């Protein structure tokens, strides 16, 4: 979180910048980085202010590690953007979207294909296989792609499929029509 600023930040500000619900987890990581000298702590009577020590030999490596999630999202989005025609919608869902993924988790990707994309099923299948292989190569995690057509998506909504509720609850939009707008339009 501190890589985004050149200013000192309080513990609360670091937690907000980290974008996580776990203040204890952020505090433990921050304190470990202070112990290692990667983060500098400036103690004041009312607060301790933290600053990334950009001169530390491990600072760049730590910044790269902190950006892993964003880099994965960027790569998947770039891969999808190269498709012709582009998907109507694409988002990440499941444990990765919730920030709970482990080394054994799949990276779940919802890709909704419009009629033009569904017309050439062989080309579409090849693109899906390539994206799945790319995700595995980039992350070591299997890319699990769910690819409903608009008709199938409408049927899932009509059947009150629990997967739709899961998508509504936690997803990361990648491209195309926003998920909630898409769900409203096909229901």
Predicted regions, residues:
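Glycine-rich beta-strand-to-loop/alpha-helix junction loops that act as flexible
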Residues: 93-95
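Catalytic core of pol beta-like nucleotidyltransferases
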Residues: 1-89, 98-104, 113-187
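Short, well-ordered beta-strand segments
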Residues: 108-110
């Amino acid at each position: 979180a501190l890589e985004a600023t050149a200013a000192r930040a309080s513990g609360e500000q670091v937690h907000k910048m980290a974008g996580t619900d776990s203040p204890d987890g952020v505090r433990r990581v921050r304190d470990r980085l202070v112990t290692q000298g990667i983060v500098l702590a400036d103690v004041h009577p009312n607060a301790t202010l933290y600053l990334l020590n950009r001169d530390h030999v491990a600072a760049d490596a730590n910044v790269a590690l902190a950006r892993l999630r964003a880099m994965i999202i960027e790569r998947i989005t770039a891969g999808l953007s190269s498709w012709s025609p582009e998907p109507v919608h694409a988002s990440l869902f499941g444990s990765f979207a919730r920030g709970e993924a482990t080394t054994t988790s799949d990276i779940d990707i919802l890709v909704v294909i419009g009629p033009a994309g569904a017309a050439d099923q062989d080309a579409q299948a090849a693109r899906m296989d390539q994206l799945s292989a790319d995700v595995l190569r980039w992350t070591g995690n299997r890319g699990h792609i769910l690819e409903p057509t608009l008709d199938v998506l409408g049927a899932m909504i009509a059947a009150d499929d629990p997967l739709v509720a899961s998508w509504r609850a936690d997803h990361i939009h990648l491209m195309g029509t926003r998920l909630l707008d898409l769900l409203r339009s096909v229901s």
